[in-house]
Amino acid sequence: PYKPKKYHTPKLMGEKMQLDVKYVPRECNANMWDDNRYYQFTIIDEASRERFIYAYKDHSSFTAVDFLYRAVCYFGYIPRIIQTDNGQEFAYFQETDRIHPFDLACEKLGIIHKTIKPRTPRHNGKVERSHRSDNERFYKHLRFYDYEDLQEQMKRYLCRSNNIGMTPLNYRTPVEMREYLISRGMTDYLEPFDKKTGLIL
């Protein structure tokens, strides 16, 4: 019988990140006149488990590119690899000579973009599990009134969630793990990213 290969989590911060999108549950929207759908983009560093999340009104490829730049600005460095599923935000469904906008953005930043095999969400397990935690910790209690309110509440939740101790990190928080990895020199290979100018330093 087939046995999946054991997955080895990167030990270096920025070596690999997982990126995914989830729907914001409609029932969280307290404004009955608002018919918009909202989407949460999420990226997680595999080594530190630090995340960045941001809400959008669509999940197009151009939105994915915008999120990529926001994420790099948030983390302050360029990751080596970003792994996604094969959603339309990140890849074309059919083979084509055209380069996807998300691939172009990754190429410009020097990031390797890897996609998982179709119908294998477990291969993006860390970001998938983080979404389940979001449902329990955030969306289960969330009521927002407009897009700006959603963004503000999501921003506060992100700060809180990055400061919760995690068993895989020996009960360190993602923020503490980031500082630990920096102190051990396990980030020296990363290219820093200037948040003000949008340039690689």
Predicted regions and their residues:
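Mobile-element integrase/transposase regions
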Residues: 1-44, 50, 66, 74-75, ...
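C-terminal domain-tail junction helix/linker
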Residues: 2-8, 15, 109-111, 133-201
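Mobile genetic element proteins and their domesticated derivatives, centered on retroelements
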Residues: 20, 43, 49, 68, ...
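Active-site beta-loop-alpha junctions of metal-dependent nucleic acid enzymes
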Residues: 36-37, 53-77, 81
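Short small-residue beta-strand/loop micro-motif enriched in glycine and branched aliphatics
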Residues: 49-54, 114-116, 140
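Acidic/histidine-rich, metal-coordinating catalytic segments
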Residues: 59, 77-94, 117-119, 171-174
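Charged helix-capping and loop-helix junction motifs
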Residues: 96-101
